[in-house]
Amino acid sequence: RCCTGKKGSCSGRACKNLKCCA
């Protein structure tokens, strides 16, 4: 789960693609 907390908040090594926060 790369998106946690705020909307569109990408953080963490697992989140390589920003698309996951679309």
From Swiss-Prot:
Please list the residues that carry the modification Alanine amide.
A22
Q: Which keywords label this protein?
A: Amidation, Disulfide bond, Ion channel impairing toxin, Neurotoxin, Secreted, Toxin, Voltage-gated sodium channel impairing toxin
Q: Which domain of life is it from?
A: Eukaryota
Q: Name one GO cellular component term.
A: extracellular region
Give a brief account of the tissues where this protein occurs.
Answer: Expressed by the venom duct.
Q: Which residues belong to the signal peptide in this entry?
A: none
**Molecular function as annotated in GO:** sodium channel regulator activity; toxin activity
Where is the protein situated, by its record's location annotation? Secreted
Q: Does the keyword Secreted apply?
A: yes
Tell me the disulfide pairings in this chain: C2-C15, C3-C20, C10-C21
> Does Secreted appear among the keywords?
yes
Q: What else is known?
A: Negative results: does not inhibit rNav1.3/SCN3A, rNav1.5/SCN5A, rNav1.7/SCN9A and rNav1.8/SCN10A.
Q: What does this protein do?
A: Mu-conotoxins block voltage-gated sodium channels (Nav). This synthetic toxin potently blocks rNav1.4/SCN4A (IC(50)= 7 nM). It also moderately blocks rNav1.1/SCN1A (IC(50)=370 nM), rNav1.2/SCN2A (IC(50)=1 uM), and mNav1.6/SCN6A (IC(50)=570 nM). It is noteworthy that coexpression of subunits beta-2 or beta-4 (but not beta-1 or beta-3) decrease by more that 10-fold the binding potency of the toxin to rNav1.6. It is also noteworthy that the toxin is 50-fold more potent on mouse Nav1.6 than on rat Nav1.6.
What the entry says about domains is: The cysteine framework is III (CC-C-C-CC).
Question: What family does this chain come from, according to its entry?
Answer: Belongs to the conotoxin M superfamily.
This chain belongs to the protein called Mu-conotoxin SxIIIA
Please give the organism. Answer: Conus striolatus
Its lineage opens with: Eukaryota, Metazoa, Spiralia, Lophotrochozoa, Mollusca
